[in-house]
Amino acid sequence: MEDILDRNLRGMTEAVRRNEITSVDLVQGFLDRIEKVNSSLNAVVSINTEIALKLAAKADSDLKEGIVHGPLHGIPMTIKDSLDTKDMVTTWGTKGRETFRPGRDATSVARLRDAGAILLGKTNTPEFTLSFQTDNLVYGRTNNPYNLEMTPGGSSGGAAALIAANAIPFD
């Protein structure tokens, strides 16, 4: 399975469609990778394990029935914490939004879900995405996987760190 987790996005989508790997295994593989690296990176600020695994099981079941939900069918992803997600808190890295749960997905999130992607969690961002480094009062600083004394930058620092650590295919 490790070689499939190391493939590019196209390779992963082809592996799922050819039944070389299930969406459940792919999602669990990336959840395991996130768990392994996130304590040192602080890249993922919230995780959606139970829902992600249920959606992956549904993607696998649908694929067996010949139903494909789009080009990203069953592929795990994360999303920046500045994008609204109906099933997860969206803080924008600011204290005033620590418990804010939007009523709907941002358009980009909805389109990714419609394309079949499975949202695993949210990645860290500077407050209001307005800094050259990813640090905020809600979740703290994100570290660069190649040098933990440095930041991966901003405003998508959580996403950048996670992708650089090969812990998610895209964000």
Task: Name each region found by the language model.
Residues 1-54:
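An N-terminal boundary/leader segment
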Residues 37, 71-111:
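Enzymes and membrane/adaptor proteins characterized by extended Gly/Ser/Thr/Asp/Glu-rich
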Residues 49-72, 79, 98, 102, ...:
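Flexible, acidic active-site loops/lids enriched in D/E/S/T/G that coordinate Mg2+ and/or position polar
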Residues 12-16, 59, 159:
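Generic hydrophobic alpha-helical segments
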Residues 104-171:
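Short glycine/serine-rich loop segments
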